[in-house]
Amino acid sequence: MNNSRLVEKIQRLKKQRNAIILVHNYQIAEVQDIADYVGDSLGLSRTASATDADVIVFCGVRFMAETASILCPDRIVLMPDINAGCPMADMITAEKLRALKKEHSRAKVLSYVNTSAEVKAETDICCTSGNAVFIAESLKDTEEIIFVPDKYLAHYVSTKINRNFFFWDGYCPTHVKILPEDILRQKKTHPKAEVVLHPECRPEVIALAAQVLSTEGMCKYAKQSNSAEIIVGTEIGILHRLQRENPDKKFYPVTELAICPTMKLTTLEKVLWCLEDMKYEIKVTEEIRVKAIRAVDKMLEVR
């Protein structure tokens, strides 16, 4: 079946189901193009919490769909591919976090939204790459912060505020593929281009950036920047949106190796099957949800 026919069927079923299609910036181009909303984790969370749709089709990875389920317990949350997980989210478990909390009993727990619902249930407040510094600054009543699971985002935040951080040894396998030599090579090839990087990158990579931004921050910055050329250091899926929204500018990936395999599992065919068969449903248990929503709600309250 060709793409236009698939899109037609998806749109018809979406209307019948009263569904909304939420798509992360790293998804393949064809999936981004059918979205009701394309964005980063923070924007997706806010859109999910505000929707009046009966069905949320989440084209991303599992923790994102879980967050939607936490925020919208009365909605049906579907993932087109049940195997679309996040390796970094899997690097920390609720059991490991509880042990860390015992070790640092005076610390507040700041969890990246890239975590399981069970980890969020053990968390004081969540953050995304777009608001991590603001969230950490909002924790006025503590000098100690446990940050899980991304050690590189934690390091970046720790350079911006004066607190005692305890890092977990987690990382994004996609962003660690971005190396200093990749940036230097691209800067040599495109000397007029500005370098914009994601805070999940290594510190030695971050040091070479003109701007350090979340994916949504990158999209906003690209529209405002006077630069006609931008070197982008994050998962390459975002290039589609950047180019679509800024047709008069040129965008170059730091490296073509920055691909998240699980983000690429979702296809138009799977979105169609998802709406036809109403699977795979992601449902966080009420016991976990009522604990986890406190941390997620606190994140959404910080502007």
Predicted feature descriptions by range:
Residues 1-232, 238-303:
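Active-site loop-to-helix "anion-binding N-cap" substructures in soluble metabolic enzymes
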